Amino acid sequence: MQNEETALVTGPLSKENIISIDKLFIGHTEYIKKITKSKDVLMMLASDQLRVALATTHIPLKNVPRTISKELIINKIKILNEDLKNKFNIKKPNIKVLGLNPHAGENGKIGKEEQVYIKPAIKELRKKKINVSMPISADTAFSRKSLK
């Protein structure tokens, strides 16, 4: 690929069928990363009103906590911030970060990932003038009030 593309839209596919042929196939996000020799990728679901980006891709839920790191959060939010500016023409992106744990961890009472990885990453990103929230509770993040 010659870096001429600005976006790629993929459709649903049966991972089960593809994995029966290629045992190393995880998902098209990882496949596209491999064939484009990209350093990192960001999976995003987008509509006219909302864009949702994922910190991880196709991994079992039990592996998510050990996959989350300060560096991962920083890299993903930097990619998201730049894409919102350059590909969605949003001059000042307002990025909300969802917590990994219920109620965004309740200050370490329900999981430590927010305290150990996510909040330090956000503090570093804010120093770089990226408009990003502290972790918010995922169970209310998509309510009408929260989306205003």
Mark where each language-model region is.
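Anion-binding alpha/beta catalytic cores of soluble intermediary-metabolism enzymes, centered on
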Residues: 1-148
